[in-house]
Amino acid sequence: MHTGQKQWVIFISMGLMLFGFVSLTHPTITDPCDQPLLPQGVTEFLAKKFPGWKILRLSDLHPENQRAWLDSEHRDKCPGVAVGNFETKEHFSYAVALIPLDRDKPSFQLVVVNKVKESYQHRLLVEPKYPANYYVIYKVPPGKYSDPERIENVQLSLDGIQMEQFHVGAILFYWKNGRYHRLIVDD
């Protein structure tokens, strides 16, 4: 191998090592909301019923809350979508955290969408409000849940929807007797 070729090989090797080091120290964060999360009919229903609103994405969260989400057991899920058997064991319901498309008007609302025969219906669980930081939502499994003081508890036979504001608290929404109820829970 000639001196020029050796220098070229060393140069390329150093570049590859440096590139590898940079990519290890700055991992690419993929947003779990990039993949299709809802059936097309639900997506179309939301676009028609809630123009000017979008589903909360990981990138919409404050950087500290992005880290908290990525460190949680829900890291592979979109913080603005929860899919589960919230109202019946026979079919899925779709909970979505909606925020305005206009970032200058921070707001938040929580909606659950169900397919009823050939159309969709929605229930508004949280009317538009103006939080300092957005809430995230996720599905919780059936089981026993209590408020922080252990005064009130509930046994869920269906999935629940947990709405959490990092470092503040969480509210559990659950279906009982034909409507949603809420319980403040430990986050």
Predicted ranges, named:
Residues H2-I12:
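Bacterial N-terminal signal peptides that target proteins for export
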Residues S13-V22, H26-I55, S119-D187:
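Acidic, small-residue rich beta-repeat scaffolds with periodic aromatic anchors
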Residues V81-A82, T88-L98, V154-Q162:
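Acidic/hydrophobic-patterned starts of short beta strands in beta-sheet-rich repeat architectures
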Residues E90-F92, L101-K105, S119:
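Primarily extracytoplasmic ectodomains and periplasmic/lumenal surface modules that are beta-strand-rich
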Residues R103-V112, A170-L172:
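Structural motif
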